[in-house]
């Protein structure tokens, strides 16, 4: 009998846990639950004898993998997987997967919550502006980016996108204007929404030079990863350009410095993009099915390491 650990410092909803357990019960697996843990030692102990693991934002590094002597697969319930040490997973012969698309609508809806809040001057009682007819640039046209484009059309916005790995014809087929570079996207957009993963290529790539291309009154919204922002350069630019706004659901390392730009900066207390009941259930159950598919049939469709 396979043993599966659900390790979530930030727990799934009860409905999601019930659904995950039902998938594993049907497969004849044992399910172990570790929620709201406060010490890494608790995780190290829990992984010692499991065959598979589901995580959310929990970090799986070499130390965790060393402790997981029987682990064959770890699935991140969500799209981003920078919390898994992929090289270490490969070295330990552990398959790492994500569940792309399961949180996409949830994140996309939050983008517009943040944008309406910013456009209405953070609800301070003064007159704001509408989203209608504004130019929205989407950086990365994956599952979240496509949902953002879909919702933007409901606001009657002009939608542009750039994705180095998505053909222009795919973007255009979705009724979105494809541009040739990130620089062009910033130059041609009133608002840019970030949906790039945190990789060696993208870390700190959102820098002063790029953001400064936004026109007067530009807004940068980040529901991707904080690591893609060059915080020092963005802080300097916000000080220089009083017309820019930055809204995010990922608290920056330099949050106290950003907070000085009252009326132009907002962050949620915690990452909120996937924090809906629907996304919670979708991602968790998808992760469970992927584990069963891998252990029973060797399916590696969403594997992110080599």
Mark where each language-model region is.
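Phosphate-coordination loops involved in phosphoryl transfer and adenosine-cofactor binding
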Residues: 1, 71, 132-135, 208, ...
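Oxidoreductase and adenylate-handling cofactor-binding alpha/beta cores
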Residues: 108-124, 153-157, 286-299
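C-terminal helix-to-coil terminal segments
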Residues: 3, 8, 15-18, 23-26, ...
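Phosphate/diphosphate ligand-binding glycine-rich loop within oxidoreductases
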Residues: 51-128
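NAD(P)-binding Rossmann-fold cofactor-contacting core
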Residues: 154-172
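Rossmann-like adenosine-cofactor binding region
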Residues: 62-65, 166-260
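Glycine-rich NAD(P)-binding loop of Rossmann-like domains
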Residues: 118-154, 175
